[in-house]
Amino acid sequence: MLRVLPTSFKSISTRSAFRACQLSPLTVYCPLKSSQGTDIKSLEDLTKLKSLEGVDPELIRKLINERTIELNVQNELEMLKNLNKQEKMSQEVSLKRFVRPLWVFFLMSSTVYLILHYVWWKLEVVEKEKELQSHVESLEMELDQTLKSQNQNVSSSQNNGNNKTNDKPWYRKWFF
C-alpha cells in the first residue's frame, strides 16, 4: 500500500520519507506475536503491554522509525503550510505598504491640478480684461474723434450763423 504526498511537497527529506513509507508502511508489517500472545501493530499496542521482554527489538525499532517518519512528514507539512501563510501575509503587507503612498500621490496630484487650473483661469481673466480694456480705449478714441468732428461742424455752422444773426438787432433774436 502506497501513501500519497501532496505534489507541492518537494523537499529532499520528504522524498526519503516517502521512500521509507513505500518500503515499510505500517499496514504491510505482519503482526508479530510476542511471547504474551498479542498482536503488535503500532506503538500504542506496545504501551498496552506490561513489559517489553518478549517483543522483538527489530519490530520496536521499525515501529519507532515509522512513527518518527510520520511525525517528520507531518511537521514538514505544517512547516510548508506556515510558509505559505507567511508568504501570503508578506504579499498582503507589501500591498498595504503602497496604499498610503498612493493616497498621498492622488491628493498631491489633485492639489497641483487645482492650483494650475486656478492659475490658468486667473491668466485667462487677466487676458480678457486687457482685451476688453483695449476695446474700450479704441471706442473712447472713436467717440472723441466723432465728438470733435461734430463740435467743429457745429462751431463752423455757428460761425456762419452768427454772422447772419449778428446783423439782426438783439430784440429780433427773441421773436424770430
Swiss-Prot record:
Residues 149-163 have a biased composition (Low complexity). Residues 123-151 form a coiled coil. Keywords: Chaperone, Coiled coil, Membrane, Mitochondrion, Mitochondrion inner membrane, Transit peptide, Transmembrane, Transmembrane helix. It is found in: Mitochondrion inner membrane. Component of the INA complex (INAC) that promotes the biogenesis of mitochondrial F(1)F(0)-ATP synthase. INAC facilitates the assembly of the peripheral stalk and promotes the assembly of the catalytic F(1)-domain with the membrane-embedded F(0)-domain. It comes from Zygosaccharomyces rouxii (strain ATCC 2623 / CBS 732 / NBRC 1130 / NCYC 568 / NRRL Y-229). Its main location: mitochondrion. It is a single-pass membrane protein. The lineage of its organism: Eukaryota, Fungi, Dikarya, Ascomycota, Saccharomycotina. The keyword Chaperone applies. Residues 122-176 are mitochondrial intermembrane. Residues 149-168 are annotated as: Disordered. Component of the inner membrane assembly (INA) complex, composed of INA17 and INA22. Interacts with a subset of F(1)F(0)-ATP synthase subunits of the F(1)-domain and the peripheral stalk. This is Inner membrane assembly complex subunit 17. Residues 1-28 form a transit peptide. Residues 29-98 are mitochondrial matrix. Belongs to the INA17 family. GO terms for cellular component: mitochondrial inner membrane. The chain crosses the membrane at residues 99-121.
